[in-house]
């Protein structure tokens, strides 16, 4: 197994290009000399990656082995352990500063190298927290990473500990071979991205001076394929909600009480069914009211994507698509909002046995993906109003509101920074990078623009 050399080399080249954004015009000979120097450096960095592959693999397995699940309180010590591991790695590669900074939730890892006076500063963002796991659905334990056919299987190996480590290894290679970087670099690794970054905005506000930067890039996005580079320009926001339906103080015996006692699971099913129309569109009144039309630029981005919806259906094993067919599949995933039931629980659900009960309570969790011009609190209010309206007789609903709402984000593609990164990807992959949207959420991205004044 080898790390993504192409991505690492793209980081090398991007840093070199960004380092010269403020340079005055150079003569032709100077430009040629600089170009040859960068080419030589890239070859040197590539050799460094090859020579250190075994070490990097061991390091990566160590980090992925830490169950840094941010949504489960009992895993908080593991999240802190992962943060400390990254801090020690940053110190080992020679960063000027490396520390774990506390927040009201999980710590943020900060590292900097500031020995390039007069040169710009770039801030590289990623996150080290991961999603929870359902271990019964894993062929191998999710926190015992295993290499299969050249790929590492483990929770967080892709999202987003690879982003953390490839960024670090790229800087490590440059410091090892050159003893310096072409510009000043700051690392910012979050520990709460998977729960909507509830404390990240306040962290940026409190540390605005420390985090001052000329550019910001995120290492939390994917390439289109292993051989086709891409730059992600938009992400959806997210709002979360948990609600409980209660029909009785306890589960009841179906032989004694069935037929006259309200069933909480049935009531929950009725509520959930009311959230959608027959085509799968969200039926909550006002849900789509503030959604902006898809722009000509967004349509052009999708037009250039070699996307095959049948491939996704085959991978997932689905037999039909849902949603408004007036929009293409990618338009629905990137530029339209969603309301998903991400989990339900109620009644007797043990793996074996059969308990003859009338369930007295049920629970469901919702994630709503938001698009530009939608507000998370407004959407949650609309959903709550709808649930209250359609809650059947004999049932009551209580709510557990999740902290914070991640806003949608769009990054412009007409900036010099975008052009430098695109040029680096073109040189490394020998292919023009695709412009992508993502249906996922990067809660930190909008805060970068609002507080630090830079796009990421």
Predicted regions and their residues:
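N-terminal hydrophobic or amphipathic helices/low-complexity stretches enriched
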Residues: 26-77, 86, 93, 235
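An extended, acidic, His-containing surface patch that forms the Zn2+-binding/catalytic region
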Residues: 117, 225-226, 283-361, 372-385, ...
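Bacterial Sec-dependent N-terminal signal peptides
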Residues: 1-31
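Active-site metal-coordination/substrate-binding segment of hydrolases
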Residues: 119-189
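A non-catalytic alpha/beta surface segment that caps or lines the substrate-entry region
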Residues: 59, 69-119, 143-146
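Polar, glycine-rich mid-to-C-terminal structural blocks
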Residues: 248, 254-311
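Acidic/histidine-rich catalytic neighborhood of metal-dependent amide-processing enzymes
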Residues: 158-234
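Sec-exported extracytoplasmic/periplasmic mature domains
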Residues: 50, 61, 65-69, 88-95, ...
